[in-house]
Amino acid sequence: MSSTRKFKKVEKPLSQTRHYSLCIPTTLVSDCRNLSQITHKVYQVAKFASLFNVSEVVILEDNSQVDATKKKISTAKLILALLQYFVTPPYLRNTVFNEKFRPYLTAASKLPRLSTLPFTRYQKQDHGRYREGLTIKMQKPTLARKKIGKVFKQTKYINIGKSKALALQSQLVPINARVTIDTITRKIVSPQEAYGDFTGLDSQYGYYTRIASSFTDLFMKGPLKEGYTQSVYVPLTTRDTSIPELSSLPTAETNPHILLVFSTWDTLARAFKLDQDQFVDCQGPQEFFDAQLPCPVSNSDVADAIPMTLTTLSTVF
């Protein structure tokens, strides 16, 4: 009898769903007094984003908060690093985050893992068939390639957090990419194949993150070529605007991607004013939103407004 264990793949059809992007301002942490408080506030955002299958988290930089002192790291970059840290497998963190960021991640390292992420199901990391990995440069490029001066942009080697890199069976992939690996077949697989039986799946690493340094960047530099299907403003304070209240969402069958912007009106107005020369015929930020969804509790904190809003969207619409 063979001692080789046979693994059976179980693939489930993906259900059609709505995809959400969250936009949070850097004022998220304006009331925090130290790194520990900032870390806990961002952890709440990461926890609810992963719980509700959020696809993207955008950090809107409030330029009015930038002070004259020279900081080693900006508030936006700190929030970004923390958000990425919470969705990075423990065995890859030393690779992903260089020494510049590690002093800012000490408090984050003491917090519990996000249990909704597929790759946290195995407490003993070596027991999982599927692992997250980072593609790294070929270790020994051929002399022929060196002579003709070609840049080595593809690789078969994957850093999966072990002492030795994994070599793919018959694939070449771009370097510096995040991938999901089947360690038995030594092939890159889709997140659906690896984690399709796990509640909370939306992408292989939880959510995509980016910084919007301006109002223009928020809408024009997203990951979707066709843009967002619908943009919804979630006011954090009571303020009359001409934006109509949300009455419906695109049907799930169309796989829509909805942008939810959590902010006070003053923050949005400041960001728009700084970019006003880009929108000559626009009267204000209200023209960029299809609807607004007031938070059940007025004057809410961003971290509190996120779960309330996502719960409303998942139950009412």
Curated annotation (Swiss-Prot):
Protein name listed in UniProt: Putative methyltransferase YMR310C
Disulfide bridge map: none
Other remarks in the entry: Present with 2540 molecules/cell in log phase SD medium.
InterPro entries for this protein: Alpha/beta_knot_MTases, Put_MeTrfase-C9orf114-like, tRNA_m1G_MTases_N
Subcellular location: Nucleus
E.C. number: 2.1.1.-
Biological processes, Gene Ontology terms: methylation
PTM annotation (Phosphoserine): residues: S190
Major site of localization recorded for this protein: nucleus
One GO CC term on file: nucleus
Keywords per UniProt: Methyltransferase, Nucleus, Phosphoprotein, Transferase
Enzyme class: transferase
GO MF term set: methyltransferase activity
Domain of life: Eukaryota
Family note: Belongs to the class IV-like SAM-binding methyltransferase superfamily.
